[in-house]
Amino acid sequence: MHNAPESVFNALVPMVVEQTAKGERSYDIYSRLLKERVIFLVGQVEEHMANLIVAQLLFLESENPDKEIYLYINSPGGSVTAGMAIYDTMQFIKPKVSTVCIGQACSMGAFLLAGGEKGMRHCLPNSRVMIHQPLGGFQGQASDIAIHAQEILGIKHKLNQMLSHHTGQPMEVIERDTDRDNFMSATQAVEYGLIDSVLTSR
């Protein structure tokens, strides 16, 4: 029963059949799209998902370091450390990474959306974006809680600096606007500088 969710997922993923010189070859739809340099970041941002995204980015760089990569994002956010692993890899690799929000890009999802190549960050018309300050929770001795409180304040400051860099907004504006959940439409995200354009068609 341990593998039941994975089996159900695999059963629901469409397969694509291609004719090759050696006969038919079948791919799951995500592997086929990876051949077109399309990566999907869907769901909660956590360590396992981050490792898969990082691996795909590195693989596509090895395949062609000069051709852009398309990262489609539909995420409510998640772990800061997992998200930073993806973000740092996006900045590290040679290919330009175009980000596209489909559905929603919230919290760390919004941060990764903004971290795409300048001029290549997009939303579809009815998607939404949300920015806020990082969340944290810790139990333990008072001195350890104080240490973790300082750490999350440091993370908050770093993320605000990076959002300021990617959006062009002053730090004081970012600090004010991330104090609470701040939802934006696709058009508002363009005005804010989180993305560069709203895509309505190819």
UniProtKB/Swiss-Prot annotation:
Function as written in the Swiss-Prot or TrEMBL entry: Cleaves peptides in various proteins in a process that requires ATP hydrolysis. Has a chymotrypsin-like activity. Plays a major role in the degradation of misfolded proteins.
Enzyme class: hydrolase
GO BP of this protein: protein quality control for misfolded or incompletely synthesized proteins
Record's keyword terms, sorted: Cytoplasm, Hydrolase, Protease, Serine protease
Broad class of the protein's primary localization: cytoplasm
A GO MF term: ATP-dependent peptidase activity
GO cellular component, as recorded: cytoplasm; endopeptidase Clp complex
Compartments reported by the entry: Cytoplasm
Gene source species: Shewanella amazonensis (strain ATCC BAA-1098 / SB2B)
CDD domains in UniProt: S14_ClpP_2 (cd07017)
PROSITE patterns, alphabetized: CLP_PROTEASE_HIS, CLP_PROTEASE_SER
Reaction catalysis annotation: Hydrolysis of proteins to small peptides in the presence of ATP and magnesium. alpha-casein is the usual test substrate. In the absence of ATP, only oligopeptides shorter than five residues are hydrolyzed (such as succinyl-Leu-Tyr-|-NHMec, and Leu-Tyr-Leu-|-Tyr-Trp, in which cleavage of the -Tyr-|-Leu- and -Tyr-|-Trp bonds also occurs)
Name by which UniProt lists this protein: ATP-dependent Clp protease proteolytic subunit
Subunit structure: Fourteen ClpP subunits assemble into 2 heptameric rings which stack back to back to give a disk-like structure with a central cavity, resembling the structure of eukaryotic proteasomes.
EC numbers: 3.4.21.92
Family note: Belongs to the peptidase S14 family.
Signal peptide region: none
Active site feature: 107 (nucleophile), 132
Coiled coil: none
